[in-house]
Amino acid sequence: TYVIAQPCVDVKDKACIEECPVDCIYEGQRSLYIHPDECVDCGACEPVCPVEAIFYEDDTPEEWKDYYKANVEFFDDLGSPGGASKLGLIERDHPFVAGLPPQNA
């Protein structure tokens, strides 16, 4: 599974959303999240991210390892909607992301 880490917070470029063939990248308030059950591990999202925020789970830098758990837990209440485009913006973030200081200040 791919993970979106800290460089995405408060940026949300969304190039990855356009590239994803299975519509598994969801938009939270401050960050984007990859649904671990819907992602097919194709990797199309990784090279198009202009801030290099997307990593394969095993390749996530040590300082951003907590983002894997945040990506998984973000979907605890949502379940598996089966496509991000029909949901649009989700007006919340994982508490780990929500608690970060503003990244674009």
UniProtKB/Swiss-Prot annotation:
Binding residues annotated for [4Fe-4S] cluster, in chain numbering: 20, 39, 42, 45
Residues covered by the 4Fe-4S ferredoxin-type domain: 30-59
A GO molecular-function annotation: 3 iron, 4 sulfur cluster binding
Cofactor (UniProt): [4Fe-4S] cluster; [3Fe-4S] cluster
InterPro entries: 4Fe4S_Fe-S-bd, 4Fe4S_Fe_S_CS, 7Fe_ferredoxin, FdxA_Actino, RnfB_subfamily
Binding of [3Fe-4S] cluster, residues: 8, 16, 49
A Pfam match: Fer4
Cofactor notes: Binds 1 [4Fe-4S] cluster.
Keyword Cell membrane among UniProt keywords: no
Keyword Electron transport appears in the UniProt entry: yes
UniProt keywords, alphabetically: 3Fe-4S, 4Fe-4S, Electron transport, Iron, Iron-sulfur, Metal-binding, Repeat, Transport
Domain of life: Bacteria
Alphabetical list of NCBIfam families matching this protein: FdxA_Actino (NF045480)
Function: Ferredoxins are iron-sulfur proteins that transfer electrons in a wide variety of metabolic reactions. Putative electron transport protein for the cytochrome P-450SOY system from the same organism.
Protein name per the record: Ferredoxin
Organism: Streptomyces griseus
